[in-house]
Structure formats: C-alpha cells, structure tokens
Curated annotation (Swiss-Prot):
Organism: Zymomonas mobilis subsp. mobilis (strain ATCC 31821 / ZM4 / CP4)
Pathway terms, separated by semicolons: Carbohydrate degradation; glycolysis; pyruvate from D-glyceraldehyde 3-phosphate: step 2/5
Gene: pgk
Family named by the database record: Belongs to the phosphoglycerate kinase family.
Quaternary state and interactors: Monomer.
Catalytic activity: (2R)-3-phosphoglycerate + ATP = (2R)-3-phospho-glyceroyl phosphate + ADP
Protein name, UniProt field: Phosphoglycerate kinase
Keyword Nucleotide-binding: yes
Keyword annotations of the record: ATP-binding, Cytoplasm, Glycolysis, Kinase, Nucleotide-binding, Transferase
Length: 397
C-alpha cells in the first residue's frame, strides 16, 4: 500500500501539526512504569519540532467513556514525556475551542504541546465528523503515529485524516513497512508461528494465514485442539473439543493452498499446572488421562528449527507453551533464540507481535534481535486476520 510519510510533508516551519501518538502507558501512582510507548514517539515528535513545527500531540489514556476524569488526564504524563523527548512539553487542557486555539497561537515554532485526553469527548470514539472538524481547526497537518490504535475508527485516528493533509509518522511508517515485508509482499517460504490458549480467539488469523504462508506452526493450548481433531487423546489438557470440525476445515483449506501445518510430535506433560512439578517428555500419542500438555517437546523444537532454517520470512504471534511458568518456557525460548540467530545471520526476516509474544521474546532475551517487534496488540492481530485497519486506510495516498 502507498501512504504519505514525513518525507512528503514539506516545509512545516511555524505550521501546526496534530500528531496522534499512543501514550496509553501503565502507571503506579504518578510514576510511569513502562515508557516504551513514550519512547516510540521520539522520532516523529523531535523531527517535527526540529523542523520548526508547532507539534500538538493527541492521545487517549484509559477509558474515561466520553467524560472528563482527572485520574485519566494526560497532564499526569506530561513530565515523563518531556523527560523522554529531552525537551519541554506544554500542556493544553482541551482538544478544541477558543482557549485551546489561543494556547496554540502562543506557542513558538519548534514547541511541543500535549493536548488533553481525546476520550474525554463522547464524539471521539463515535468518529463524530463535527468533533473532527472542531479539532482540525487547531492544525494545518495531521500525522498518525499510533499503529496500535489504527484498528479503531475514532476522530483522532481516522476522522482527522479526512479534514487535514494526512501523513504517517515514523513509528507508523516503520510498522507498516515491516508488516508489508512480513505478509503483504513477503519473500517465500514464509513460516508463521501461532500460539496461545484458544483456537476460538485466533480463528480469523488461522483462516487468513493458510492462504498466505507456506508453513503454519501451531503451539500453545490451541495445538491441543488441532491434535484432538486428528484423533489424539490429549488427556486433561486445555482443549476446545467443540471446535474439532472447525479445525478440520482449516486442515482442508491448508491442503488446498499447499500450506503445511506443523503440530508437535512430542510434548511435555504434567498432572498439575504449577512451577516445576514432576514432568514427562513423551510422544503425543502417550498422554495419560490425568495429564495435561504444557509445552512442546525437544524433538518437535528440532523439527521446527529446520522449518525456520528453510524459511525466508517468519511471522510470530503467541507462545508455544505455558511460557510464564518454568519449565514450560523451554520450547518458546529455544525457537525464539533460533529465529533471532537466523535473523542476525541475515537469512530470515522475523516479525512478531501481540502482548504475550512480546513478553515471551523479552523473557528469551531476543526481542531486540528480531527484524521487528510490534507492541500493537489488537491492531497487530486484526492485521494478521487480513482486516483493513481504518487508521491505516485513511492514510493511503
């Protein structure tokens, strides 16, 4: 897809640029506990400020449901944002109206201002064109730098793109280019790892992927449902037995498209789900009635390693086992390290996303070695489902 970036925006000196960022950060009291999202804003905000623009940051924080709520005011993160950006940040306690316009006029070229929480206004989440028109009066240009909110058609993520010349910020650009390389126009063979507890939450992802990838690696609790559909007794493992027919449909679709589905040949089982219980590593055919599958076994990991070695592109969403409890993190860590090594060697483009996935890659210590790790959550999942994202669609040139 073609979209305009900051390279296309032209001279912004003295111009007012409304920039949508994702600043929805976790807090403990008045302390930001994870500033990843604040840091993602640095390239776009500082580039525009250095070019002399008046940078007006729009963002949401929490779920105030269309009502002002001091607990969710963006004033609370102004100082943390200033610290990350390395420059002063003004605060304007509105997103529209005369007082906000006067505050914007008073800013010097190159200044950065954080506007109030967009979700304090009922029209934001309804994508109200009247609110979009009011907010647009504050700006000359609109930049969307928040891929993580791109699956929402809100005023600040979609509506403004129809009221002002619209561009993708640097973080948005980086995300879109990485996703295009992973599934849009990838280098084949393409492998996808899809894990997590339930098939039901990733049905659309699986259906989309069988038509796009050469190898589909199934892990986590959802692998149990796939195994059960093939007649394997999975004991008391987490399993959606009622979805066996649906899974058979996915197998049939994969056969038509030539996509090979990989399921574990051996597994790690325990009788209870807790840290370091007695475990057995066994072929999938040997699971006892009182045992549950909690990780993929070493033979399966070795086979999957060969799949990655033969692939050129990898898309990863979801862990292979119950990685949050040792020792059921071993398969995820081993395969993640292999993917990272192949990426560093230049033989694999690796793109990963989703909350559990990011946590698993950080746990394995390899997130920095993947080609791209998306922190976008819902937007990343909808992209994997093949859905059109309103915030991205609105930026198309």
């Amino acid at each position: 897809m073609a979209f305009r970036t900051l390279d296309d925006i032209g001279d912004v000196k003295g111009k007012r640029v409304l920039v949508r960022e994702d600043l929805n950060v976790p807090m403990d009291g008045d302390r930001v506990t994870d500033d990843t999202r604040l840091r993602a804003a640095i390239p776009t905000v500082n580039e525009l400020a250095e070019k002399g623009a008046k940078v007006l940051i729009l963002a949401h924080f929490g779920r105030p449901k269309g009502q002002p709520n001091p607990e969710m005011s963006l004033a609370r993160i102004k100082d943390a944002l200033a610290g990350v950006l390395g420059r002063p940040v003004h605060f304007i306690n509105d997103i529209k109206g005369e007082a906000a316009a006067k505050a914007v006029d008073a800013l010097n070229p190159g200044a950065v201002a954080l506007l109030e929480n967009t979700r304090f206004y009922a029209g934001e989440e309804k994508n109200d064109p009247a609110l979009a028109a009011e907010v647009a009066k504050l700006g000359d240009f609109y930049v969307n730098d928040a891929f993580s909110a791109a699956h929402r058609a809100h005023v600040s993520t979609e509506g403004l793109a129809h009221k002002l010349p619209a561009f993708a910020g640097r973080a948005m650009q980086k995300e879109l280019e990485a996703l295009e390389a992973a599934l849009g126009k990838p280098t084949h063979p393409v492998a996808a790892v899809v894990g997590g507890a339930k098939v039901s939450t990733k049905l659309d992802v699986l259906t989309n992927l069988v038509s796009k990838v050469d190898h589909l690696i199934i892990g986590g609790g959802m692998a149990n449902t796939f195994l059960a559909a093939q007649g394997v007794d999975v004991g008391k493992s987490l399993c959606e037995h009622e979805l066996k027919d649906t899974v058979k449909g996915i197998f049939a679709a994969a056969e038509k498209t030539g996509c090979k589905i990989h399921l574990p040949s051996d597994v790690v089982v325990a009788k209870e789900f807790k840290a370091n219980p007695p475990i057995r590593t066994i072929p999938v055919s040997d699971v006892a009635a009182d045992e549950m599958i909690l990780d993929v076994g070493p033979k399966a990991v070795a086979a999957l390693t060969e799949v990655l070695k033969a692939s050129k592109t990898l898309v990863w969403n979801g862990p292979l086992g119950a990685f949050e409890i040792e020792p059921f993190d071993k398969a995820t860590v081993a395969l993640a390290k292999e993917a990272a090594a192949l990426t560093k060697a230049g033989s694999l483009i690796s793109v990963a996303g989703g909350g559990d996935t990011v946590a698993a890659l950080n746990h394995a210590g390899v997130a920095k070695d993947f080609s791209f790790v998306s922190t976008a959550g819902g937007a990343f999942l909808e992209w994997m489902e093949g859905k059109e994202l309103p915030g991205v669609k609105a930026l198309e040139a």
